[in-house]
Structures are given as C-alpha cells and as structure tokens.
C-alpha cells in the first residue's frame, strides 16, 4: 500500500485529524501511476539529490526517496511535519524542513546534503496560488538546479512553455525560457486530487540551459522591456513602450530610433516577438539611453 492510495490517504488524514487549509493551496495527489510517471519524467536515480516543495503527507516524497540519493522537502504547514515523520519513518534519506521556501537560505540547506556535489533537481506539486513566485525565486537564486519537474495549474504551464504568436505567450514565457527549456510532459486531471481543485494540472519539465537563451547588455532591463511589452496585450509594441517610457517628443524619437535599430515595426504586438527580438529591442533601447 502506498501513501497516495486513496484509502491510505483518507486514513492518514483521519488518524491525525488533519483539515485542509485553503490559504496553503493544499491538494493531495491520490494516483500512484501519476506519481511514478513524475519520477520517471524527472529521471531520478541514486546520483541525484532532490528538492521538493510542499510534500503534503509525503505521497510524492515516498516515490522520490525510493529513487533519489537524498530528498529535502520544504513544508510551510507545521501541522504536516508530525504526519510526515510518521508516513516517511522508514526512509533515512529524507529531510523535512518546516520553512517557507521563499524565505530560507537555500544554499545553506543544500550544503547539508550528504553529497552536495550531486546534481540537484526540483520535483514538486506546487501550490497554485504561489507557483510563479516560487519558480522565479528558484530559477533566479543562482543555485544550479539541473532540472525542474513540477506540477502546476495547466494554464500556467501553458504560459511558461508558450511560443511566440500564441495566446499563452507572454512575459512569463520569456522570464523562464531565458534560463530554461520548458515543455509540458503530461496533463493531470483534477479528479485524482483530494480535495479536487477547480482546474486540471500539468507536469512541466524544465531543463537549465548551459547559458541564457540570448545575450543582453542588461538582464534586468531586458525583463522590464519584455514585461512592459505585454501590459496591454491587444495594443501595439509602440503603445506599450510609450506607456512605459513616456510620450515626450524626445522619448518618442529615441523609441523610433531603437525600433529601427532592432528592425521592428512599431505596429507589431509583443506576442509576435521571439526572445532574440526582445534581446535586440532591449539592447537598442539601452543604447538610446532609455
């Protein structure tokens, strides 16, 4: 019997008198086939350390611990810590950290792995309400995670992995794909969770690039420009850029020169631009002193 078997999950919750907190976005997976598929997608073996976020009662953790060298699971809900101590008691390669992943010194914890030099993968069922902040925090942390295999709301997974000229493509696609390749591995129906969420989920596989997808003069500025270009999706690049940088004649002159330098039409929409075109645009705007 597995932790994720529906009857076992129910028994664990009842035994510990656990009630779900909406504020933590708790939805526990009760399908062992999907859990195995997640581990297979992440290609976990004894030469890999794993960071898990939001282990819940340990359904995914159990599968990860069987395959990985070590698992470090960050759980914000202190009510779940004694439950995890119970459900994972047979594993000596799991550390549960009762902390908010957004607030810890992650490098310090990673140094505590028995073999901290092994590749580190992030495998998690992320809370819907805070998926993007967690992902960006980890991606931008400077810690060289080799791979992320994470479950999230299907719509968010589609946005992250989207390509130009699609409805889902936006600043989030650019922010992630600058650092990682991103691909939806498979869809997870809502009915396999307790409690069932209102939407389906997706498993997103992201692999870190050896170097960023494009070269830019100023990374922060590149992300600001891409974000500004999607503020009003139906508006042209020109309208979004003038809204962000200003509408004085001097600014308009600089914007015109930058667009010409980047070989972009003012009437194009942000969703049509590739990462390479955004890089050219950001560098051109920077060169114009904007």
From Swiss-Prot:
InterPro entries in the cross-refs: KsgA/Erm, rRNA_Ade_diMease-like_C, rRNA_Ade_Mease_Trfase_CS, rRNA_Ade_methylase_Trfase_N, rRNA_adenine_dimethylase, SAM-dependent_MTases_sf
Keywords: Cytoplasm, Methyltransferase, RNA-binding, rRNA processing, S-adenosyl-L-methionine, Transferase
Superkingdom per UniProt: Bacteria
Sample GO molecular function, one term: 16S rRNA (adenine(1518)-N(6)/adenine(1519)-N(6))-dimethyltransferase activity
GO cellular component: cytosol
EC id: 2.1.1.182
Compartment annotation: Cytoplasm
Primary location: cytoplasm
Pfam families in UniProt: RrnaAD
Catalytic activity field: adenosine(1518)/adenosine(1519) in 16S rRNA + 4 S-adenosyl-L-methionine = N(6)-dimethyladenosine(1518)/N(6)-dimethyladenosine(1519) in 16S rRNA + 4 S-adenosyl-L-homocysteine + 4 H(+)
Chain residues that bind S-adenosyl-L-methionine: 27, 29, 54, 75, 100, 125
Entries under PANTHER family matching the protein: DIMETHYLADENOSINE TRANSFERASE, DIMETHYLADENOSINE TRANSFERASE-RELATED
Similarity section: Belongs to the class I-like SAM-binding methyltransferase superfamily. rRNA adenine N(6)-methyltransferase family. RsmA subfamily.
Matches recorded under NCBIfam families: ksgA
The protein's role, per its UniProt record: Specifically dimethylates two adjacent adenosines (A1518 and A1519) in the loop of a conserved hairpin near the 3'-end of 16S rRNA in the 30S particle. May play a critical role in biogenesis of 30S subunits.
Name of the protein in its database record: Ribosomal RNA small subunit methyltransferase A
Native source species: Streptococcus sanguinis (strain SK36)
């Amino acid at each position: 019997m597995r932790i994720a078997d529906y009857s076992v999950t129910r028994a664990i919750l009842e035994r510990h008198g656990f009630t779900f907190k909406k504020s933590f976005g708790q939805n526990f997976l009760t399908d062992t086939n999907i859990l195995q598929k997640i581990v297979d997608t992440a290609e976990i073996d004894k030469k890999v350390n794993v960071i898990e976020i939001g282990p819940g009662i340990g359904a995914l953790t159990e599968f990860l611990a069987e395959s990985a060298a070590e698992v470090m699971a960050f759980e914000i809900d202190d009510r779940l810590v004694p439950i995890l101590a119970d459900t994972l008691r047979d594993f000596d390669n799991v550390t549960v950290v009762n902390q908010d992943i957004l607030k810890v010194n992650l490098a310090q914890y990673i140094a505590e792995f028995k073999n901290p030099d092994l590749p580190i993968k992030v495998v998690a069922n992320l809370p819907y309400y805070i998926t993007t902040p967690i992902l960006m925090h980890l991606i931008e942390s400077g810690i060289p995670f080799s791979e992320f295999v994470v479950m999230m709301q299907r719509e968010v997974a589609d946005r992250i992995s989207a390509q130009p000229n699609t409805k889902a493509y936006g600043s989030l696609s650019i922010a992630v794909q600058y650092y990682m390749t991103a691909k939806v591995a498979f869809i997870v129906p809502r009915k396999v969770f307790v409690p069932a969420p209102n939407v389906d989920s997706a498993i997103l596989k992201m692999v870190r690039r050896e170097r960023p997808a494009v070269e830019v003069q100023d990374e922060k500025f590149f992300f600001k420009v891409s974000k500004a270009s999607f503020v009003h999706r139906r508006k042209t690049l020109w309208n979004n850029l003038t809204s962000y940088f200003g509408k004085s004649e001097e600014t308009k002159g600089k914007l015109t020169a930058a667009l010409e330098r980047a070989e972009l039409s003012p009437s194009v929409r942000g969703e049509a631009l590739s990462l390479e075109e955004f890089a050219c645009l950001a560098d051109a705007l920077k060169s114009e002193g904007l």
